[in-house]
């Protein structure tokens, strides 16, 4: 068979498996608890792979590999930061959260927050739902954009056709199968991602002769690729940038798309094994991504030509190095395996899109319609409404992706991937951490944390970096870290200014 036939065969097989998962999961659909939380029946293997596949997105396959090509070993600060965040979420938060959500009978993160703070006004629920719909739409639109780019890069298919194919498949299994289909597909897709990010650098190291030749070649190309500071020393901007990379893992410590998996665990005893699986997955996949970029910088080097593209410069490895993985796959792998890597890149994208769409639909249907507008609605009606909401939110994200493609043709997807991720994390993570560990934390404090995080992400993205003096430091730090810390500080201050909440026996028992 010719190379294109192999590529299309691998893609068709991958898409067929996803559609089969959606059909199988839809046959088990009985009620809204099944649609949104898989009836809290998942084991550690499913939850660990699903949480990691969901938490990474296209950024792992295209963004982190590009970072490895652009900055070399400095990219390992991200690996360390993500490992710390993953372990913090599993070891410090998962058990308490799982215990409390069972005692509160929560199906969603807003369910948990409202029960934890006894918020009869539904303010926490409404703020949570609004933030999820806004930032999930942004995040998913970036992933849809990446789907079109993947089809374009690997197969030469028009961007719009690629978007239509990817969008149609992910909507089909997400709408029909709900959360269980999402988790099953995440296990499949997370396995593909891990396989691909271990196999490609292994083949690359074999081709180049090992680690020492890699180091020697990188030093000849650009010595700063072997420097943890990028060759600039520990200046304030470098320190801030390094902190920003290290603290990227904060986003795992409370983000609803991750914690929805902890909520669905069948038993808290699954957490220890799940933590180990998640840690190893992160170590291997993230390290493989950075190594892939570094190997691409050597194996695809073109002397005299810019390698890393910018807004003003066309680079051989694409803007920010984000084309290094597809180019290296074409360089090293036989045609039959190129088809596998198309599936792997799409796995990174779709495993995030499906999870976020079901999460946002739960916010709209469970947290607003059922809990606030129509408490008497039947479960069988909710499942149908949830499917409609998933479809509508997906169409909104598709519309945003098409608008961005039309008005900003020279875009890179990754700034608004990080923007959407940071928005979700800064809104929820401070409130989740304090709600699990600080009995003095109040309902008004939680509201203040969430609103502050929600507003500070665009502030630190678009306004603060342009300020004289401190602007470059905050620009290097990225928006998540300052927004996260400010949201936590404001929530603590508002809580201390108010009346102490009643003693929460369930919170005390969950900490034991």
Segments and roles (model prediction):
Residues 1-512:
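Membrane-embedded helix-loop-helix hairpins and adjacent transmembrane boundary segments
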